[in-house]
């Protein structure tokens, strides 16, 4: 029996929202099918933070590992989706406490009723204390359906610094609009980009049974 899949990755295209000043997605055709050419070949340019992505420690730590040198285990396995819809600007412990019993090692928080298709300067982020408590419970990956686990205006990146210190991994820009609260299998592997500070992922959830 085939287990149901939920695609939790947004479409990546020229209109995909990016942090102000970041590199948007663009594509050009280097070759097209026609006389003397049997294939279409394109070149793409984008920030690795466009769409669903995994941050590497290098993104928030000058001496951190690049995404191509990060262990993959955290990005694959049992996961819990917790709803904190409309909560913010920070997701506090009280917003997720109803669903933290017997947590698996991966937690994704849904804050949007419907994910926006344009940049959201007022995005919801994790409160650093929430990340600390999740780490205390053995969580090794956190994710969110906004562009960052820190507020868009943050210069200190307090929640990123918690995951640096506690050794957690992170997924951002997920789409959880159609996902009920509960437990799933997460599959969200980053590319082996040897020197990059992040990587796009094709994030999916799979039913446990």
From Swiss-Prot:
Q: Where is the active site?
A: 59
Q: Name one GO biological process term.
A: L-tryptophan catabolic process to kynurenine
Name the NCBIfam families on file: trp_arylform (TIGR03035)
Q: Which family does it belong to?
A: Belongs to the Cyclase 1 superfamily. KynB family.
Alphabetical list of InterPro entries matching this protein: KFase/CYL, KFase_sf, Kynurenine_formamidase_bac
Q: Where does Zn(2+) 1 bind?
A: 49, 53, 55, 172
PANTHER family named in the record = CYCLASE-LIKE PROTEIN 2, KYNURENINE FORMAMIDASE
Q: What class of enzyme is it?
A: hydrolase
Question: What's this protein's name?
Answer: Kynurenine formamidase
> How is the cofactor bound here?
Binds 2 zinc ions per subunit.
Q: Does the keyword Metal-binding apply?
A: yes
Q: Which reaction does it catalyse?
A: N-formyl-L-kynurenine + H2O = L-kynurenine + formate + H(+)
Q: What is the lineage of its organism?
A: Bacteria, Pseudomonadati, Pseudomonadota, Betaproteobacteria, Burkholderiales
HAMAP family under this entry?
KynB
Q: What is its EC number?
A: 3.5.1.9
Complex formation: Homodimer.
Sample GO molecular function, one term: zinc ion binding
